[in-house]
Amino acid sequence: MLSTMQTVGAVLMLSIVLVAGRKRHHCDSKYYELTPAHTMCLTDKPNAVAVPLTQETEHEILEMHNKIRADVTDAANMLKMEWDERLATVAQKWAMQCILGHDSGRRGEPDLPGSVGQNVAWSSGDLTFLGAVQMWADEIVDFQYGVWTDGTGHYIQQVFAGASRIGCGQSACGNNKYFVCNYYKGTMGDEPYQLGRPCSQCRSSCQHIRGSQGRWGSLCDCTNGPDACFNGGIFNINTCQCECSGIWGGADCQEKHCPNEDFDDMCRYPDALRRPQHWCQYDNFQSDCPILCGYCPNPN
């Protein structure tokens, strides 16, 4: 029989284990399931103070980005950006880490498939958020389309044609200020847009707006379209709709439309002639053989 002291010790040890377990899961499970190292699972620095953005500042940051994008006179597919609170929440969390650097790709958003980009700035002076946005944009002086140049990554992210959503956050850490913007989608390429006349790939959704220098520019306005396309769907910037494939349908390609038999004949042959089932890891095979791969029930 355990003594009272042993019992208390056992309970204490159990409590420590349980608390430790909870600590590892202190963030929302949707982020933890992406990666336990997700930005939303980090602990804020003790000296970090959140500096909430006003709606006016959010609007100014968004408007400034769209003006910068409208300044690009040879982009055929430049999307208009809109504000996204999901991205802003993660950006704010990273700002609370007080680090002049990026969060190593741990900023993904479960509701937005694909990569999320990020721009970060730091100042111990009187730099404002709009000043940080302009500082990133000033990298254009070293930008050359199709040629990667160090020191232009912030500008490239600002004018990545496929970046349709932005969310930002800021913090104060002692005498230092940190500014963070997250973008969906992100890019690291040296060709951030397709060359051509502005809006030439989106004539049905084209909107003319004034750029940062007061000149008129054009952006593909799909802000009323779906947030993203899932399950391999392709976003059509002319119609502002997802083009789904295989068994997937609906506005964002998340509705499953199961067939009575697999689309690919090879998936319906006797077992000995079937394609190897481990091929189901590939997206095109999942679309061709949804029953064989277990995405749809076998009606037989």
Curated annotation (Swiss-Prot):
Signal peptide: 1-21
Entry's localization field: Secreted
Chief location of this protein within or outside the cell: secreted
Propeptide regions on this chain: 22-24
Tissue expression profile of the protein: Expressed by the venom duct.
Claim: Transmembrane is one of the keywords in the record: no
Keywords (A to Z) from UniProt: Cleavage on pair of basic residues, Disulfide bond, Hydrolase, Protease, Secreted, Signal
Cellular compartments per GO CC: extracellular region
Entry keyword annotation includes Protease: yes
One GO molecular-function entry: peptidase activity
Enzyme Commission identifier(s): 3.4.-.-
Gene Ontology biological-process entries: proteolysis
InterPro entries according to UniProt: CAP_dom, CAP_sf, CRISP-related
Alphabetical list of Gene3D superfamilies matching this protein: CAP
Functional description taken from the UniProt entry: Protease responsible for cleaving the conotoxins from their propeptide precursors. The target propeptide requires minimum four residues including a leucine N-terminal of the cleavage site for efficient substrate processing (example: Xaa-Xaa-Xaa-Leu-Asn-Lys-Arg-toxin).
Name recorded for this polypeptide: Cysteine-rich venom protein
Natural source organism: Conus textile (Cloth-of-gold cone)
Origin organism lineage: Eukaryota, Metazoa, Spiralia, Lophotrochozoa, Mollusca
